[in-house]
Amino acid sequence: MSPVPAAGIFLQMTMTSSLAVRGLLWTILLPGFFAGFLPWRYFGLRNVVIDGGNPRHLLGVAAIAIGVVLLGACFLEFARRAIRTLAPVDPPVLVVQGLYRYVRNPVYLSVTLIVLGEVLLMRSMALRAYWAVWFVAVNLFVIRYEERALRRRFGRAYLRYCATVGRWLPRRPTQEHSGWNS
């Protein structure tokens, strides 16, 4: 037997492991850092006592739960399609399935919902300001960097996608979805 197939399998496993670690790090860096660590550490989220009779608290818990479920669905979509990264900075393919059929930025939207839920749990002006800064910063990043990079990389397919799928507000999918990657 030639050592080449074993070396090829090892190389593939190493690349897959490396990409998985990178994806996991990105997962921790974006949602974990911005929606988890910062509010927990610097805005007092760790001191919140949820009052089940408080409608604002119930709405906050619902927003966090929806954000977490949507975020999980996004990551599962990437994993299911064996996409090599979860980072928005180097997408290998244009993802238009799953939640991406309805909204172009479901990961950012999910994190925004989670932080909004945290705002509803607390009466913190600092956390409200943080949420507003997060939302503005994400918009600027998406519009000034990510969308431009995706237009350069995917051309007409991305332009068609943008024409039918909202950046932040979900839209009903059209029949055109099947031709976006062509």
PLM feature segments, named:
Residues 102-109:
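Histidine-centered phosphotransfer motif of kinases
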